[in-house]
């Protein structure tokens, strides 16, 4: 195998790596209702009711819960949707994005 062929093969592999994944997390607070968190999880993250309740309980008991993993742009959009909805409805709910 020539050096040029090895270089081309490596470049091809680098160009075809999957995009990085980012987790969108909700953070617990003492004021946001559990019902609102479940609403966010079902309407923005499209979780089923049972899964939404499980994530909400994780947020409540552990302080942080993963809502889903996405590419960076989608994760940031989901975060903005959560923050806008929480603000509009008077909840201090916080949402963060972290590279997974």
Swiss-Prot record:
Query: Which InterPro entries is this protein grouped with?
Result: ClpS, ClpS_core, Ribosomal_bL12_C/ClpS-like
Known Gene3D superfamilies for this protein? Answer: 3.30.1390.10
An annotated GO BP: proteolysis
Output this protein's name.
ATP-dependent Clp protease adapter protein ClpS
Gene that this sequence comes from: clpS
Q: How does it assemble?
A: Binds to the N-terminal domain of the chaperone ClpA.
Stated family? Belongs to the ClpS family.
Report the function annotation for this chain.
Involved in the modulation of the specificity of the ClpAP-mediated ATP-dependent protein degradation.
**Species name for this entry?**
Neisseria meningitidis serogroup B (strain ATCC BAA-335 / MC58)
């Amino acid at each position: 195998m020539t050096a040029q062929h090895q270089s081309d093969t490596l470049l091809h592999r680098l160009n075809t790596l999957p995009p990085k994944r980012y987790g969108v997390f909700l953070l617990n607070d003492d004021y946001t209702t559990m019902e609102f968190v479940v609403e966010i999880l079902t309407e923005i993250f499209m979780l089923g009711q049972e899964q939404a309740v499980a994530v909400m309980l994780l947020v409540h008991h552990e302080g942080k819960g993963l809502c889903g993993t996405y590419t960076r742009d989608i994760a940031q959009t989901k975060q903005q949707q959560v923050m806008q909805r929480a603000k509009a409805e008077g909840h201090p709910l916080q949402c963060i994005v972290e590279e997974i």
